[in-house]
Amino acid sequence: MMNAHFAGVGDNADNAAYEHGIQVIDEDKMFNGNVSTYLNIEKVIPAGFNYHLISVFGSQSTGKSTLLNHLFGTQFGVMSEQERRQTTKGIWMSKNKRESGGSSMAENILVMDVEGTDGRERGEDQDFERKSALFALATSEVLIVNIWEHQVGLYQGANMGLLKTVFEVNLQLFVKDSQSTPRSLLFFVIRDHLGTTPLKNLQNTLVQDLSKLWSTISKPAGLENSRIEDYFDFAFVALPHKILQPEKFDEAVTQLSTRFKEGYNDPRKSGLIDEATAPIFLPQYHRRIPADGFSAYAEGVWDQIVNNKDLDLPTQQELLAQFRCDEISREVQVAFDETITPLEDKQAEDARAGTHSLIPDLGPKMNAARQKVLKDFDVNASRYHKGVYKRKQAELEGKVDTRLKALFQKQLTAAHKSGIEGFTEAVSAAVKNGQKKNASYDFAQIVDSEKKKALTKFEEDATAMAIEGAAWSSHENELKIYKKELDDVSGRLRKEEMRRLATRIERWVRTRLDESIGLEFNKLGSGRGGSGAPEHGDRPPTEKDLWDRVWTIFTDTVKMAEKRFTDRASSFDASADEVEVGLWRLRRKSWGVLRAKIDEEVMEGNILLKLRENFEDKFRYDDLGVPRIWRPTDDIDGLYTKARESTITVIPLLAHFKLAKTSKPPPLDAWIGEAPASVSPADEEDLSPIGGVDDDEDKTLEDEMTILSDGKQADLLVRFKKTADGVYVEAKRGAIGGLSQIPFWLYPAMLALGWNEIVAVLRNPIYFIFLILLAVAAYVTYTLNLWGPIMRVANAASQQGLEVGKERLRAFLENSDAGRQAMAMSGSGDSNSTRRYEDVKMDRLNGDGKKSKSMEEDLDDI
């Protein structure tokens, strides 16, 4: 009958379906994924290593299933006595159910019934036979070879060809040394033994056949001299005929069942178990696969066999261990994730927000999570393959430590950055507080105090987050980096403070130079103390040594600024190089301030005003500084020429920054000096290039000292001459205006003759108010200089009114009889005159209200 109450491949069965066992592999070579479910139902999984696996191998219809059912009380399907056909398809498994076994049999014996070989159903297709036999040999501790007595000595009948293939493939795929390969027991059960041929003789025949078979198989390199006894032990038993001698058969089977118990390895034995009561299960036969991993192990073995992959049994053990260890690792990491993931999310959120907050109690949380996950893994995975367990333990520890290390490093980085930020803010706040109090604070002392606080805080935070037993949680290297960055930040803050100091001193220099240099240039506008033009005497001090005074004022001011800078920098604990760079920058910046001030003073409007003032002081005042009252007898032309030429010579003087003592530009390059060796690009990025000082500039020192270019000088000269000419014309008018004065006696005469009219106007309010309004209007008109335009407009309007009146009169005369007669009596000249003006428009009048010259020329042409 077929197997009943067995869970087949793909069945989604309940517990009742597993009553008698499970189909491990079906006839289509599909592995049943519910094997672990069956083992769990049979309570084999909790046994760990305390289980044993037996397989049966033999030809079809030789009673393999019957033998197993009698030995172990299983319910494997057996062949019907009315027909001889295949009964077992695929590979089936059942747990030992022999009730009479008692304590004489080992616990948790698993029995696999393998499809028989040489069946007519599969015919010449021996692929499944080879694979199922190899699977049974690879997974089982004991392989029962079921053989009839009359098959002993036969090649095909005893399945020697199939055994040869299995041995050959098994040897090629096994580990290449016998010491590391688990041994297996080939248990030959000789059926239907009549007793005519002693069991000993049958045993010798089988051993000889197997040894001969072993010598003919292909062996891997290094195993050419290996023997079959190096890999297999043999046991033999003979059973009476089941049909002809049923009582003896049952008795022999019962006696045989008592041998399926655990024994030990007797060193006196060497591959042959010939005692009738010797235990079958020896320690060296066990594959050392935990029961909870057997399903995955068997499935991996079968998968490699089916796909013709290499079959390395120790590797399969490792694969099982890898599978289970990976599974256990995933399970124990669930609780680890519950603790660590929120911490990682918090750090990620802080990173996105750009903040550097410290997570409270991070160190204790990480320590507790790490210890728990490693302990849970050790408890559940330590019974598997030691090498794999150790490797997976290291991998798990590596994964855990990778995540914890990331947390630790980010927390340490947060402590680092927050400490740096806190240090910077504390120093800046202390400096600002000192500035508010207007006190002379000690910057170096502030930095030293805040640095000690920052280091103490960092070490406390780093110690609190350390992981026990993790070498990577040391913060010594980070502490060194932190100290170095504190030093760098201190240096940067010191540089910034020195920059601010330099900026304050630069403002002081700018203020002093604005006042002093502006005063020197203002002296150019006064020429009253001079002694005449250069050709008649020396230039005034205000003009001759202008640049000498400017240079002296500049260098003295910068010298005082340098002293201020040096004295203040001493409280910053600045190095000599930093002070040197600061002074070098101060000199360059100060020169830029002076150059900007000079450019401001010589701007077109400013310098032209100063030249005019200089000219007017020389022209309108005498040598004693007394203002001149121009008379017709004065030599206005000579004084004008003298003053103008004297002022003109100031322009070339201003054009170039040259010292009067040397007639050369001041030694600006030597005064600024070479750039210090410690200067950095950041120190130079805000500095303007200086000609003659910077080698990479096209300008020379002469170009740097050029204040006015030739083009500007020429333009300035033209503008000044126009201004001077205006002053000259005004002086001429003043001198001539004195000749046409109104006689003094005329004023009393006008007052006497007009007294009555004056009194009438003053007594009449209307006239008086009207007079006041006229006076105000006249004053406003005079102030706005509108008398000229008003006169021209009035003249033009009167002329245009006259022309319009003439046109109206002419039109009237042309429309009346008397007028036409009068016009007829007039001469032709009058008509020509009429035509001459009839087309005159107001927009063709000139400023005096008369026809423009172009209009008159047009009329003449006509």
UniProtKB/Swiss-Prot annotation:
Biased composition (Basic and acidic residues): 833-856
Membrane side Cytoplasmic: residue ranges: 1-741, 787-862
Residue ranges that the UniProt entry lists as topological domain Lumenal: 763-765
Gene: sey1
Protein name according to UniProt: Protein sey1
Residue ranges crossing the lipid bilayer per the database entry: 742-762, 766-786
InterPro entries linked: G_GB1_RHD3_dom, P-loop_NTPase, RHD3/Sey1, Sey1/RHD3-like_3HB
Primary residence: endoplasmic reticulum
Family affiliation: Belongs to the TRAFAC class dynamin-like GTPase superfamily. GB1/RHD3 GTPase family. RHD3 subfamily.
Summary of the function given for this chain in its UniProt record: Cooperates with the reticulon proteins and tubule-shaping DP1 family proteins to generate and maintain the structure of the tubular endoplasmic reticulum network. Has GTPase activity, which is required for its function in ER organization.
Annotated region described as Disordered, given as residue ranges: 524-543, 821-862
Gene3D superfamilies, alphabetized: P-loop containing nucleotide triphosphate hydrolases
Naturally occurring in which organism (per UniProt): Pyrenophora tritici-repentis (strain Pt-1C-BFP) (Wheat tan spot fungus)
UniProt EC number: 3.6.5.-
SUPFAM superfamilies: P-loop containing nucleoside triphosphate hydrolases (SSF52540)
Subcellular locations according to the entry: Endoplasmic reticulum membrane
Lipid bilayer topology: Multi-pass membrane protein
Keyword annotations: Coiled coil, Endoplasmic reticulum, GTP-binding, Hydrolase, Membrane, Nucleotide-binding, Transmembrane, Transmembrane helix
